[in-house]
């Protein structure tokens, strides 16, 4: 069996380099969801319907809640109301086979059933109440310390106390 693709985020916190997060994508169970995320890491699909590049580079983690998760992926508006998939509109929930079992789980943020775009979150704890509602499509394999550093500047409202930016991102060739 082919190995899962790996992608990376080079993160900054408050403008300072914070390290690299490497994520493995579950292309076996969630191929459509994983491919969307992979392509948004590389930027290879060009410009989307919004007129913005279909690329996470330069976008922020706009919602960070300690003891819950770090959310990003809104590269069109930057505030949690935007984002766009490589498929154009929103796309369906592929399946809920994988669960929110603990820190480092990578899952799709949504606004209800079948509303996946580009927003995602990385769990910092087990979030089993999200099972069956959000599609788990990967996990952090390196840089959980960076995720924890991001979590530390979160707040109960979700607004980070410093800007958290994906300075660079892409796919790691195996």
Curated annotation (Swiss-Prot):
This is Peptidyl-prolyl cis-trans isomerase CYP19-2. It holds the Pfam family Pro_isomerase. Widely expressed in aerial organs, at high levels in young rosette leaves and flowers, at low levels in older tissues. Its EC number is 5.2.1.8. The keyword Zinc does not apply. It comes from the Eukaryota. GO terms for cellular component: cytosol; mitochondrion; plasma membrane. Keywords: Chaperone, Cytoplasm, Isomerase, Rotamase. PPIases accelerate the folding of proteins. It catalyzes the cis-trans isomerization of proline imidic peptide bonds in oligopeptides. InterPro entries: Cyclophilin-like_dom_sf, Cyclophilin-type_PPIase, Cyclophilin-type_PPIase_CS, Cyclophilin-type_PPIase_dom. Belongs to the cyclophilin-type PPIase family. PROSITE patterns: CSA_PPIASE_1, CSA_PPIASE_2. Binds cyclosporin A (CsA). CsA mediates some of its effects via an inhibitory action on PPIase. Residues 8-171 form the PPIase cyclophilin-type domain. It is an enzyme of class 5 (isomerase). It catalyses: [protein]-peptidylproline (omega=180) = [protein]-peptidylproline (omega=0). It is found in: Cytoplasm. The keyword Metal-binding does not apply. GO terms for molecular function: peptidyl-prolyl cis-trans isomerase activity. One of its GO terms (biological process) is protein folding.
